[in-house]
């Protein structure tokens, strides 16, 4: 269809023009036939001419000309069928032949009815009916519309004018609910369309007076009938668009009831009135009444001011909840909440108050309410505090009352977890005194004050304390210069820590906190000699008690003691720095030759003292001691010596020699060690001689000549000396190598020489001429030259140089000549290209002759030219042009000469052979030339145009060409070349011209012409005379040649061939030169094809033909365009091809075919139109989309182009249902269909006058069932029923579905598939199922209705195998097998069997099948019942019962115990009463009692140890370490009395009571009741048993019992007085004997010391304090060992620790002098003193380690190290000091020589800023030399408390023989003291021992700290002791330390280290015991020990 008429006309016109034929043919024709329809026409005509070309042109008043391509029917008949015409339109048809013949015809097309005619149901009402239609295609004058009733009688008729959009008409005043038929006909002019009929109905009237009666699960509906026709009513109850119930009722009914509805739910009720296929409705929102909430609970969740309200949402819907809170009828708060909220909270309430909560469920305007009560938690008391200042056994608590409501307070006192008091006080109380409870001093108790309100309570806790007691036996343990140690015993009761303070007068110096386990403390950093007050305060919380003591530190020794003689021979002066701290005075001693010369006391303000009248040169010692408070400090010693006297009469003589001096003197008076004679010069000693004091002369040789020597004779005595001085000089030496130089000067001579050796004063230089003196100069000795000026040029002189030293001198001579002067006024007189002429004036002074030289580049041009001394000019000839020469004139005098010079330049020559060329360039000229003769510096080349300089350039001399750029094209230039040499120039000229420029912008254009081309260009640059234009063919053959003047810009070539390619060239001409050609190419336009036509077409195919084009062409391009002008397809064909076909085109589409003729890049085209046949639609599908009265048909659009679709729907019986025409649709909905019915649809595709169709089927969805319900719901089955759809609908069956998809069995109990019910089997118990039912329509092709759904849950099964059993006395455990059901959990209740009181009730998760029920009453029967719950379904109950176990009796409170005031005592017994009420029988009846007895001591416990059984009386009597025992068990008779609480029984403890075990028999190991000790404090507890023996009277291993608190101490009576007196007498006798023995030994010791010590001498070599030792029982010999059995060690250690470690300190004092009598002479040698770190820690000579001597040095074998024996070898260890920087090599040498494999280091290199040991090993893995040994670290393992390193060591002489050494470095030993715990060091020692045992061939193990005695001795002793523990049944710590001190001084240096060894042994033994009890042999012995922490209280060096 050609819709774009105007555009198409233009295309056709162009086509006609382009395809016009060459010859005209006359074609007459006759019209044969013409036919029209609505959209097309058919016209035929006949002609007898041939061939003819016709065109059919037609048009209307609404469209322009359109064309129809005629076809030849036969040889003479033509026809054309115009399509796509407009219906109802008048067309003018014109048939035209190409020769001008034509004919005209007028035809009108038929009008079309409306495309869509329908009843507008939206505008149709009860009394009106509106129809509407779309405009007909084409032209319509009006529409005729008729209305018929159901009897086919015409009722109304109307004419409606044409409209551009929808047209409509409404019929009025019709009857409600009646059926009608409407017809419509389109009219256009005289023509009418066929009529179209539709059916319609008016809408029936709705019901009236709709009424509702709501209930929670039902609604009652009532109404009144409306007017008009009614067939039936349909009642639809909907919920949010979903139908809940849908039912039809008879038209006579006026009410209906809906049941099984949701409470409180809002429904949409619609009552539909149905008549004539239409319906009208009235709807109303209706609501069921809501239900009240369930499980309403009001809880406080432990909160004070809020209540949480929770409830379960009621069935159905709730819009909101109205919640009110009230108290005693008054509403306090109300709120409204919306679901799904099922809880809320009321805040800001009064604590402890009872409230009423009411919840109203509101659904719309309806509501239902429910109430419950709840109480808030009472508030805690506020400001709860305890108060105590002075009470040690009581305190008071105060509080502020809480806010809100409460009833009373409960006061509970706790001792940790033990309740001491539980009482109730009134609400008006605000304090409570906790007294009369015998609380323990210093203990912290916890007090809980509980506020009770109803059954709720709230509590607040605080802590209260009793005041602690002060420490006991506080005393000063030790003191030194800066520290003061105190010790004490722990107080009674409890405390948390100690506060240690130290007062210096009124100033607090130290204030520190210590742990409660501390028993001593050392104050450090104190002032020496000062008196301090130390205070120890016991702290318990913020309460305290203090105890104080005074002590004084040892005064400090003075420092920096110096003794100085101040250069005096008979006096010594001493000074020192005052000692720190407090000093009373200083004691100063002067000692000479071990004799005290003076003993003076000086004031503390003095720090110096002097000694007079001393012997010269003597050595004295000064000793200074500080004294403060009667205590002396350590002594400080310094030495000093007086100065010796000097000699006299010193004489010196050189004997006339320059290298010799002799010295003599008189002997000095006094003591002299020797003389020292020295020769010095300028303060530096050149030679010295040591002369014996008996000799008084000496001589020196090999001295320096001329030197003045200072001669010193020194008298030496010790380090001091006296001196005598004089001086003398040696004879000086001569100078050497005199040199005289004129320095190239004419009036000057310089004299130089080599300095004379030795010393001298200066030089004298004299110059002469022929023996006549001229000048003498004095030259300093530092210089070796001098100058003489104003001499005669060229003259010879004599020079003399003399050396002067004091009164001595020596001389040497030499000669020299001055330089002559040069000539004057040397001038270049004349020059040419080859000549130079010079002149000069004569020189001054003496001249022998002149010499003239000519040089070029410093090379001589001619031989030397000699002239007489009178010559003044010379001329050089035959020289080179332009060359630069140098002319020299020399003045000669003797062998010396002087020169003058001048430079000369010859004139340069011009260049030759100039050539100028443009080389085809338009803007440049190239100039070349040949050089002239001689030298040039450069060339200057210039270009001139018309005598104006254009360019000028300087060219290097080696260049011979130059190019001028940026010149004008085609112009003439003059070129000038200048030769330059120095300042001289020469020039030559020449002429040249540039090439003309080519034209630009050459273009060849065809102006779309087929036979001409025009070439154009732009003017050429520069100078041009004319242009030559050449025309050439494509192969370059010249076709034409023309010339144009310089002003021309284009030229046109005519008569060319179409489509042919040409070339054009243009040349610029100037001065006979041609430019480079400029070229362009052009082509004429090719001709288009003619006679273009369509030869064949089909639905996917089009074929075209044409006549070939004239001229030249390359190919054809053929294009096929879509209607939207997009390219569909293209092809390129050969020029000989005259037809082409297109395949696979789009159906029904109108295409445009264009053929383009190509020649080169030019083309010409022709075109024509053609259409393909349309296609049918695809994938036609019908769908009901879950609707019952509609079908949707959808399809894929038809391929290609089309005009519209025609849709025809048929009923199952073949009758047509509906007919529609649409274009752009792919889906159509048919409405008003029967539910479940099958329909057939035809879809016809139209494109132009062509069409195609396809068929599809569809079935509507059947109506759904309704009223789904469940019945007979059991565990595994149920019945389900529903109501089916109406009978007038189509359906076949029902389908039942469910979720979850279990394998169920569905049974239909009826024979018909349409039956409305099924029975379901195989359900899972307790599972929730969702069932849905659908209606099925059809058999093979089924459709389904919307499902109706319902939920149901089966009942869960009950649990299996419930079994309950007791767990303990207050708990039972129940287990069961869960049911094979779906369930949420269990509902569990536990009741007492006797009272049916619920003790336990809870919901339990489904995952659990085991439950522990606790907090029950012991020994009661309980019934446990369990139900399985699954949502709202509950299983059958399952029950089981059991009895709880018996438990230990409840713990009696602290006040329930034996009262010490209610007892009768004797010396061996205690009589008291026990009441049955002391123990409750709630945990079981008390079966037995026992009495527990304990001796009272300071460490008393509150209750007996939880141990069964306790020791018996016999064990207590025979083992002093046992302090507690029990009696035999006796049966309880408390349960025999109805009122057992008042029953009591008497106990007489210690009276051999039968019930307590009776009299004790040592032969029987049983519990008994023996007599108590006289005058002994006992504490008594009663132990009650609820379970002790089984039925066979066998005792349980773990019986159940409880104890009362121990009574307060009850002391038995004393023995008679006679026994006491006897004991006292015996004690006094023993004391007297002991005093006598002590006196005897003291006297004996004093006598021994008086014999050994001289009275007049003081030794300062070794300071050993005196000590007296008493060793009773040893017969005067010191003990060497003290082995202790392992099983007795802990008791032994406790005895040593008694009385502040008194015995242990005494034992350590016994070791003080062990081994000290041995000699240390080798260590004291002066050569070895520097190798000792400390001067008081020296190795004994007998046990020291010796190194191999080096170079026969007897002291090279010394190192401060000692052999120490072990348990296995005599030399098992080497104890040594930490290496010094100078002894590191010796240390490793010792390790190498002693075959050491293991080194133990127990110190840090630096501790507290002080160097303790040098870092003597490599810091990384790089090897280092230590002497001759090479050491390399192999590995390093760093652990938290020690580090293990491995070293590889070898000798430099034996590199292959290396050895591995392990280095064990313990890093946590504190600077002063011992490690904090024993565990760490024990583990370290065992680690080292393990490595030692794995090195069987190794030598001794080296152990060192800093000094090698304290920590070293502790380590060695501990290693030996641990080995004893592993191999023996005894341990000997004393013997081990004694043995160590025999081999090295001070081993185990401090008492705290000695104590620490005992603690290690104790902890190891404890660990062994614990390991044995745990029966775990792998348990480490150093673990699971509760180690005590230790700190050394004594500063020590180790």
From Swiss-Prot:
Binding site for substrate: 1871, 1905-1911, 1949
Active-site residues from the entry: 1905 (phosphocysteine intermediate)
Bilayer disposition of the protein: Single-pass type I membrane protein
Record EC number: 3.1.3.48
Cross-referenced Pfam families: fn3, PTP_tm, Y_phosphatase
Stretches assigned to the Fibronectin type-III domain: 23-109, 113-206, 207-291, 292-384, 378-466, 470-556, 557-642, 643-733, 734-821, 822-913, 908-994, 995-1088, 1086-1173, 1176-1263, 1264-1357, 1358-1449, 1449-1551
PROSITE patterns to which the protein is assigned, alphabetical: FN3 (PS50853), TYR_PHOSPHATASE_1 (PS00383), TYR_PHOSPHATASE_2 (PS50056), TYR_PHOSPHATASE_PTP (PS50055)
Record-given protein name: Receptor-type tyrosine-protein phosphatase beta
Annotated organism of origin: Mus musculus (Mouse)
